[in-house]
Amino acid sequence: MESIEQQLTELRTTLCHHEYLYHVMDAPEIPDAEYDRLMRELRELETKHPELITPDSPTQRVGAAPLAAFSQIRHEVPMLSLDNVFDEESFLAFNKRVQDRLKNNEKVTWCCELKLDGLAVSILYENGVLVSAATRGDGTTGEDITSNVRTIRAIPLKLHGENIPARLEVRGEVFLPQAGFEKINEDARRTGGKVFANPRNAAAGSLRQLDPRITAKRPLTFFCYGVGVLEGGELPDTHLGRLLQFKKWGVPVSDRVTLCESAEEVLAFYHKVEEDRPTLGFDIDGVVIKVNSLEQQEQLGFVARAPRWAVAFKFPAQEQMTFVRDVEFQVGRTGAITPVARLEPVHVAGVLVSNATLHNADEIERLGLRIGDKVVIRRAGDVIPQVVNVVLSERPEDTREVVFPTHCPVCGSDVERVEGEAVARCTGGLICGAQRKESLKHFVSRRAMDVDGMGDKIIDQLVEKEYVHTPADLFKLTAGKLTGLERMGPKLAQNVVNALEKAKETTFARFLYALGIREVGEATAAGLAAYFGTLEALEAASIEELQKVPDVGIVVASHVHNFFAEESNRNVISELLAEGVHWPAPIVINAEEIDSPFAGKTVVLTGSLSQMSRDDAKARLVELGAKVAGSVSKKTDLVIAGEAAGSKLAKAQELGIEVIDEAEMLRLLGS
């Protein structure tokens, strides 16, 4: 039996070695036929000795039984998105912001990568073995695609090499090469199956198959671009260093990753990649530019849901020509009137486009647009279609002027445009059915009050039937009233009522965001909630006081102040509170007023804790006035080291930062 085990081990080692050479090093040593022969030999041996099959065997990529549905995986470290720039001027402005924020004349080097047009995934390895994989999802929670990811040959089931961390989350992009995409569509046309519009859709559809056996037949591949969870091990202190280390462990990394010493070198890299784009063999839509130093990344931090130390420099979007058949005007949540061009449908970058935004009246005037014109359409950022210009040389004789409305197309209220602003707005407020619908949709959305099951179509019907006028009216709904809506049976109606009841318990930050105050997104709402602590304090705040909140300037402060000065808004808030909407009392975290050994200190947690979860530890430290950071820098005051602490502990010792263990932390928390 020992000889069989040895034979299996040698075959698996040989196959993994050749997968590494093929997918990571791009330097295969053997023909595909020889690889296939070795795989057949391994599969035959494992069939005869199923008790010796291991989870990391190359044969285990073929796919398991179909799933009924995907389960959810919560990301321990959120998967953030990136801000975009679309021209050199915007990139240079980003470069200047980075330099200005560092304020210490430190040299910034940039790690530049291809922006792959695929699907972002996170892959967790424990002791070097792949244990789970998830999609990005909403950034905090993704779908469990472990079975499907295991079928992708480019992704190692087991890392090889030395000093592999106990827990390592590899992040990257799963994508479909152009040749594989064409083959899939060729097969689909021959068999009458689904034809995909572009490789990204094909990759996403392949990766989100409930049957992993289907995924296994798709030639998906993968490139790593970063790290999430890191426990029980060390990594280099530069982004490029980390990517090179991943490559040594067997994780595929693009060979186009380049270190640039200046903004000029970054621009040269961008233009070179743009030139090479047609010959790459897979789709990209730009380059990603990251500050290479991890210490500088820590100093720069994050804003909302994106890092300040990275940006995606997008390529010019693909363009097509078509005709404008009409221009209609939509009314948004804040009353903004947006002209929308109705187009003769045309395919742009693999997507059928029939509408395009015209932004505002100034944009229509700038374009000189008339109804009936031939126009150039671009998918800005490869996402939102917009009209780039009018083809004046081919203007038909029967074009018509675009007349911007003076009254709301929905409620008839006056349309006003404040001097200095580009946007015209309906003055109807919640009297306007369109504003009411959009405001309510925002109020119940996942990141606001998070009312499960309350979809857009339900909101539309509630407003049209005049069941609901303000957000507070939602909490007065009964199952009986809801059953009067289309496709709303008693069970679903009761589920919605239960969800509304559950949503009454929220947080101050979510509540503020749900109110839909102009210019107040999630990050600003969280900042206001943390600074003022109570609704009463925020309502009473002056414009000057509001500007003391980080990232709140005069414009946002004015919008917040004006919102709470409006009697109708205060009445809606009072009604919501009367209906039972509530949140926990604020936790005082003024370090100057807290008698705690952690007050005012920047603390970093590393390693695993045995007596409490990391989240609980963070919460207790924040309550006691600490700022909990994610990495060690010169600004760190204290490092708490649990079991298997790695690079953070080493860096703390190198910098002479105070280090305590979990037992000492618990003692201090108790004091």
From Swiss-Prot:
It comes from the Bacteria. Pfam families: BRCT, DNA_ligase_aden, DNA_ligase_OB, DNA_ligase_ZBD, HHH_2, HHH_5, Nlig-Ia. Residues 593-671 form the BRCT domain. Zn(2+) binds at C408, C411, C426, C432. Belongs to the NAD-dependent DNA ligase family. LigA subfamily. GO terms for biological process: DNA repair; DNA replication. Its cofactor is Mg(2+); Mn(2+). The keyword DNA-binding does not apply. The active site is at K115 (n6-amp-lysine intermediate). It catalyses: NAD(+) + (deoxyribonucleotide)n-3'-hydroxyl + 5'-phospho-(deoxyribonucleotide)m = (deoxyribonucleotide)n+m + AMP + beta-nicotinamide D-nucleotide. InterPro entries: BRCT_dom, BRCT_dom_sf, DisA/LigA_HHH, DNA_ligase, DNA_ligase_AS, DNA_ligase_CS, DNAligase_adenylation, DNAligase_N. The gene is ligA. NAD(+) binds at D32, A33, E34, Y35, D36, S81, L82, E113, R136, E173, K290, K314. Keywords: DNA damage, DNA repair, DNA replication, Ligase, Magnesium, Manganese, Metal-binding, NAD, Zinc. Its EC number is 6.5.1.2. GO terms for molecular function: DNA binding; DNA ligase (NAD+) activity; metal ion binding. The keyword Metal-binding applies. It comes from Shigella flexneri. This is DNA ligase. GO terms for cellular component: cytosol. DNA ligase that catalyzes the formation of phosphodiester linkages between 5'-phosphoryl and 3'-hydroxyl groups in double-stranded DNA using NAD as a coenzyme and as the energy source for the reaction. It is essential for DNA replication and repair of damaged DNA.
